[in-house]
Regions:
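A short, Lys/Arg-rich alpha-helix, primarily the initiator
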Residues: 1-19
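The alpha-helix within a helix-turn-helix
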Residues: 11, 22, 52
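Short alpha-helical DNA-recognition segment
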Residues: 16-34
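Helix-turn-helix DNA-binding elements, focusing on the entry/boundary residues of the two helices
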Residues: 18, 45-48
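DNA major-groove recognition helix of helix-turn-helix
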Residues: 36, 47, 66
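Hydrophobic micro-packing sites on short alpha-helices
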Residues: 47-52, 62-63
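Short C-terminal boundary/hinge segments that cap the last helix of small helical domains
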Residues: 56-69
Length: 69
């Protein structure tokens, strides 16, 4: 099983930059960048809440579970 972070697609859809999201959420730009490029193996739940609020979306819009084949 894998969890994909769809932050890059959502930001592109909204024409928002990583820097814009960092400013709106107060999350460090490096953390946003790691999530954007799917380089993190864990995510702070508070950050997910802040991101969903800033992007006006649900958790399922930025996270997806890919089952094992």
């Amino acid at each position: 099983m894998a969890i994909r972070i769809l932050l890059s697609a959502k930001l592109g859809e909204l024409r928002m930059t990583q820097a814009d999201l960092a400013r709106k959420t107060g999350i460090r730009p490096n953390t946003i960048n790691e999530m954007y490029h799917e380089l993190c193996d864990r995510v702070n739940l508070e950050y997910l809440d802040k991101i969903c609020t800033a992007l006006n979306c649900d958790l399922t819009d930025i996270l997806v579970r890919i089952p094992d084949e």
